[in-house]
């Protein structure tokens, strides 16, 4: 995403954290704007042409000649773009996502951020997408549903383009939608911080982790930071196993551990 500084100011000047965001997450490019968004609420929605008469005489001109020209500073015509990698990394740090960034081919303005890993051996892909319409968001989510075999997380700036069609697609895949403006805010560092606990944000996915009494395969909740020397496994009686990891322990059957079949 890129735009003239005039447009960034117009869109985000009402946000009290905008100066901090601008200075840390926008990057100057070598390009200059030839048009900017019209600030007049006339209903036409057409851009204004940027006309340079002199270095200090730059104006945004209404092409419909409905309104007077607006004086622009040279800096306001400079094109700034999002520091996408910095934003992606900040989101991952704030939300406890294992950062493994990749651009997704064929999906515009969409990135694989990494994985949400509630416990060792179980991970959920996390995708950030920035779309400008309901239709494009539907197409992105439909493509993700077809290409991703497991439940996943879709993160978008807001719920503005979230439609019933997207909600249905995600529900069919037991997947989750997260709106950044609802769950993150910009702190003073500057860094992104969560508005609620991560276990609450990702609760629908955490609930998919099988428990010890589920009768199926379970996932041992390995404490964060546990190293291999801190893990101990003891086979008991031919059908149960006890696991210690740091200060956590548990006793499970071979079936729960996915070891009942000789193939495992």
Protein language model regions, located:
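Intrinsically disordered, low-complexity protein-interaction/activation regions
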Residues: 1-78, 164-167, 187-264
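Short linear interaction motifs
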Residues: 17-22, 97-114, 129-138
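Active-site metal-binding core of divalent-cation-utilizing nuclease and nuclease-like domains
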Residues: 77-121
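Short acidic, S/G/P-rich loop/turn micro-motifs used as interaction or catalytic elements
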Residues: 98, 117, 123-137, 146, ...
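Secondary-structure-rich domain cores
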Residues: 115-122, 141, 263-264
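Short, basic/hydrophobic alpha-helical segments
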Residues: 138-152
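Short beta-alpha junction loops
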Residues: 155-163, 182-185
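Acidic, Ser/Thr-rich peripheral helices and adjacent loops at domain boundaries
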Residues: 169-187
